[in-house]
């Protein structure tokens, strides 16, 4: 599998190092592949909605996504200030999934989570979404597995009760090939954070080997023949 880098217009002056690590699981030919991009601690401009974008360009030979998890590493800043999304052109229209939308912000707690930095995995199978489940007052780096925020409302008006309308399963069935764009912005004043790295952990749709498919068809044929007797 080939991993190439493409500079975004926002980061075209920053050299990025890309690392592709393939992990193969031997169950029925299924494979999970981790694509990781290290951004060398690029600043996320404080209180600036223009943010920064980082792009991974993948070439998998047309493989289709069966499931997707996203790793996100951010150093510093206030976690409740961050807004982030993942965008991909899936071949039949583009998909955008909101990963962060000012975690912890609610009507009761308008300033959101008082923690700095995170090293998390975002997965639809996690117990809680990051907005509602983030630790509120520990002041430490947040770690663990969370569902993506999914709230597409304006970051300046989002609350915990805003509807979640985007999920990582929205990418399922799409080709993995092409540009994957991570956008992140700091929507509040305070401290400058850095995007350290991010990753895509994909399981691809398994296509049966021709010999396996033939064996299944032969087995079905034998079964039908026995019924007719």
Please describe what each predicted stretch is.
Residues 27-30, 225:
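Bacterial Sec-dependent signal peptides at the C-terminal "C-region" and cleavage site
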Residues 1-2, 21, 29:
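Low-complexity intrinsically disordered segments
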Residues 1-4, 54:
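Protease-domain processing segments flanking chymotrypsin-fold serine proteases, especially trypsin-like
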Residues 31-206:
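Loop and turn regions of beta-sandwich accessory domains that flank beta-strands and are enriched
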Residues 208-226:
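A short, hydrophobic C-terminal helix/tail in secreted or cell-surface proteins
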Residues 12-18, 211-215:
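Sec-dependent signal peptide recognition
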Residues 4-16, 229:
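Bacterial N-terminal signal peptides that target proteins for export
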Residues 17-26, 221:
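Bacterial N-terminal signal peptides
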């Amino acid at each position: 599998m080939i991993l190439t880098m493409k500079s975004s217009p926002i980061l075209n002056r920053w050299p990025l190092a890309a690392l592709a690590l393939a992990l193969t699981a031997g169950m029925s030919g299924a494979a999970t592949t981790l694509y990781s991009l290290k951004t060398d601690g690029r600043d996320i401009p404080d209180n600036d909605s223009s943010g920064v974008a980082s792009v991974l360009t993948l070439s998998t030979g047309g493989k289709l996504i069966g499931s997707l998890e996203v790793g996100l590493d951010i150093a510093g800043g206030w976690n409740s200030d961050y807004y982030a999304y993942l965008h991909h052109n899936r071949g039949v229209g583009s998909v955008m999934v909101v990963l962060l939308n000012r975690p912890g912000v609610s009507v009761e707690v308008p300033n959101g989570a008082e923690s700095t930095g995170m090293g998390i995995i975002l997965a639809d199978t996690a117990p809680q979404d990051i907005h509602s489940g983030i630790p509120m007052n520990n002041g430490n780096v947040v770690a663990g597995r969370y569902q993506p925020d999914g709230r597409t409302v304006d970051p300046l008006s989002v609350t915990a009760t805003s509807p979640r309308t985007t999920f990582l399963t929205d990418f399922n069935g799409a080709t993995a090939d092409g540009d994957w764009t991570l956008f992140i912005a700091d929507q509040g004043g305070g401290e400058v954070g850095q995007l350290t790295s991010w990753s895509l952990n994909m399981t691809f749709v398994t296509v049966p080997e021709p010999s396996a498919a033939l064996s299944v068809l032969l087995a079905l044929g034998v079964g039908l023949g026995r019924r007719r007797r």
